[in-house]
Design a protein with these regions (language model features):
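N-terminal carbohydrate-binding accessory modules
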Residues: 1-3
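Catalytic domains of carbohydrate-active enzymes that cleave complex glycans
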Residues: 303, 310-587
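Catalytic-core regions of glycoside hydrolase
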Residues: 6-14, 19-25, 29, 34, ...
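A structural motif corresponding to the C-terminal lobe/cap of the Radical SAM core domain
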Residues: 62-63
Length: 668
């Protein structure tokens, strides 16, 4: 079997660090490694190409830009290139589009169209891409290539609301074509990541790339699991060879959704399966992430990376064989049986901590915004409901039903028990104090308890709401108890930091090696505290909007979360004027929508916010209707007789994203 290229993917997502690369170059001598990809601070304004350019040709952007930060990035990347090249490793830098420094829209207003959306096929954007590439190679001339991503950026490249004006596949071809041609001129490698948060992302990106067959040669890099590194997801159906292009598979070893290197997470069995899937797809290059937020696999459970290396080297070796090899080499005989048991316990414990019945609990930052975005509150709904309405959320297993609050609490109790069991076993074994397991299992005892407190508070919210207790006595008591537990776990009073809400992608600047208190306790304590305000707001909205209705939904409320169809990052919910609300769209997902099914009445009523716009688009049973709130934020539509259920979809109409409170039907 032909051996694929092996790339280590580094610094996810942390500042450029030459000393770290020096360390990895030494480690690479123990394995076959051909090249490096560098993520860097990709979720910040200073990631990718933008962090290497001072924009001095554009006065407003130049004035807003941190020139010292840019100079430091240039110096660090040039050092990294020198270190890597001396070891014979090529370096490919991650970049996202569309990213803009503050002020650049004043310098180049032509970047936006008449609808206030990004002009994705205009000359101004094409010139800007060429400018970014030219300036990058002026400052880092030895860079070997670029890895481009078209999602999770300041502006959407594939989700604009007018697909006739900006057909996604043509937009992708337009952008890729510029990158490919400019890099070909310079003799550099171009790699296109097909990563997306919904199936439509993959379809559009792959179609746009494949349309360039015969005109350009580049590589398509696709994740080994669809969307993100979730062990409960199936094989990625988009991991396929496109005619005329090479294929790379992006893999992961630390556990982005499994503790990010802060929890024990041996998963050799899964890794061997991923390698075999990639080999079956004809992958030319395996890209393996070896760190997360400053936690490197070689300081942790290196067995995971060893599993990739051995599975790629030997197509007959099994997970059991790899484990046996590693254990015999690296687990001292007096600890071996115990370490093997800890590996087994860690897998189950982590899965029961960071997932609810197989659904990802935390996306991005641990905050209320992403719990609402990720369909998490839908899992706590009373009774048995299908999760089919979570079809726009990549991490939801839509064939399942809501597990029930009792089952969720039981799952978290078991996670705590497993963490306690693991730490007790480690204490009994008593390996040297510098063994990495000490930190991971001590973390596990804290994290499992913190997550359990969050789940207890959410469950109390739903219990009180279901019982109609407006003063939420169970929730208040549980929040008080949970905050006390957070303080106990921290050893002092936990600081609760309020996060600024962004309707779109926030720039994450501090991603490096945060403490468990900062990473877990502080944000989870904040969420628990916010639940009381959420309860009061939802109760107020129900009293204000729903009396006398035939059927009604509080669009941004937690209790009705399971009834709202939306894309993961497209229609964020927040409290506004003391009421739960939800936007339809943002500049990352201008085509964002809110879709619901209501029992039919003879009138449909929509309530919303009029501060920024009264206009929106209503799609009622497939019929598009330009709609507008009255001065009180109310819109009504007479419904004809028809099927028992009416489907309602809300979208933007114009430049401004509309914000909604409630949708209901009445018989009048």
């Amino acid at each position: 079997m032909k051996q694929p290229e092996i790339t280590w993917s580094l610094m996810h997502p942390t500042p450029l660090d030459p000393d770290y690369v020096r360390k990895l170059v030494k480690k690479a001598s123990e394995y076959r490694v051909d090249s490096f990809e560098i993520c860097g601070q990709c979720h910040s304004p200073y990631g990718g190409l933008d962090g290497l350019i001072d924009y001095r040709e554009y006065p407003d952007a130049f004035a807003s830009w941190d020139k010292d930060k840019v100079a430091e990035n240039q110096r660090r990347l040039n050092d990294i290139l020198a270190i890597s090249h001396a070891a014979g490793k090529a370096v490919y830098l991650w970049h996202r589009e569309v990213m803009l420094p503050p002020g650049l829209l004043k310098d180049i207003p032509e970047l936006l169209d008449s609808d206030g959306e990004f002009d994705l096929t205009g000359d101004a954007f094409a010139s800007l891409i060429r400018y970014k590439l030219a300036k990058t190679f002026e400052s880092v001339p030895d860079l070997d290539g670029i890895v481009l991503t078209l999602t999770e950026a300041d502006y959407s490249a594939i989700h604009n609301s007018d697909t006739r004006k900006y057909p996604p596949e043509k937009v992708v071809s337009f952008i890729i074509g510029i990158f490919a041609s400019e890099l070909e001129k310079r003799g550099r490698r171009f790699i296109m990541r097909s990563f997306g948060s919904i199936a439509e992302d993959y379809e559009c990106i792959l179609a746009g790339a494949e349309a360039l067959e015969g005109r350009h040669q580049f590589e398509i890099e696709t994740k080994i699991t669809p969307y993100d590194f979730d062990p409960f997801l199936s094989v990625n159906p988009f991991l396929r060879k496109s005619p005329g292009f090479t294929l790379s598979a992006e893999c992961e070893s630390v556990g982005e959704f499994m503790g990010q290197g802060n929890m024990p997470f041996e998963h050799v069995y899964k890794i061997v399966g991923y390698v075999r899937e990639g080999q079956a797809a004809g992958v030319d290059r395996f890209v393996i992430r070896i760190d997360r937020r400053g936690n490197c696999i070689f300081d942790l459970y290196e067995i995971n990376y060893y599993a990739y290396a051995r599975a790629l080297e030997d197509d007959k070796i099994t997970a059991a064989g790899i484990r046996r090899e590693w254990q015999e080499k690296h687990y001292p005989e007096q600890y071996r049986a115990g370490f093997i048991e800890l590996d087994r316990l860690g897998w189950e414990m982590v899965c029961k901590t960071y997932f609810i019945d197989g659904q990802v609990l935390f996306h991005g930052n641990y905050c209320m915004k992403y719990l609402k975005a990720g369909f998490i509150f839908a899992l706590f709904a009373a009774g048995k409901h299908t999760l089919a309405n979570g079809r726009g959320i990549w991490s939801i297993l839509t064939a399942k039903e809501t597990p029930g609050r009792a089952a969720i609490l039981k799952e978290k109790d078991r996670a705590v028990m497993l963490a306690d069991q693991g730490l007790a076993l480690l204490k009994k074994l008593d390996p040297p104090s510098d063994d990495h397991r000490w930190r991971l299992w001590r973390n596990a005892v804290v994290v499992t308890r913190a997550v359990r407190e969050l789940v207890r508070c959410i469950s109390a919210y739903f219990d009180d709401m279901d019982a109609g207790k407006a003063d939420c006595p169970q929730l208040k008591a549980q929040v008080a108890a949970s905050l006390a537990e957070f303080d106990r776990l921290a050893g002092h009073k936990v600081e609760i930091v309020k996060r600024e809400f962004v309707n779109g992608m926030e720039h994450r600047m501090k991603e490096l090696n945060r403490s468990i208190e900062e990473l877990v306790l502080e944000p989870l304590a904040a969420i628990c505290g916010e639940l009381e305000a959420e309860f009061a707001a939802e109760s107020a909205a129900r009293r204000k909007f729903l009396p006398g209705c035939r059927d009604g939904i509080i669009i941004g409320g937690l209790s009705d979360d399971w009834r709202i169809v939306r894309f993961m990052h497209a229609s964020h919910a927040l409290l506004y004027n003391g009421l739960p609300s939800r936007w339809a769209g943002n500049r990352v997902f201008p085509n964002g929508f809110i879709e619901m099914e209501l029992v039919r009445g003879n009138k449909l009523v929509i309530h919303g916010v009029t501060d920024e716009t009264r206009k929106f688009t209503l799609v009622c049973n497939g019929k598009r209707i330009p709609a507008e709130f009255d001065e009180k934020g109310k819109f009504s539509l007479i419904l004809p007789s028809g099927p028992e259920k009416v489907t309602v979809r809300l979208e933007k109409n114009g430049k401004v994203y509309p914000q909604f409170y409630a949708a209901l039907t009445r018989n009048e």
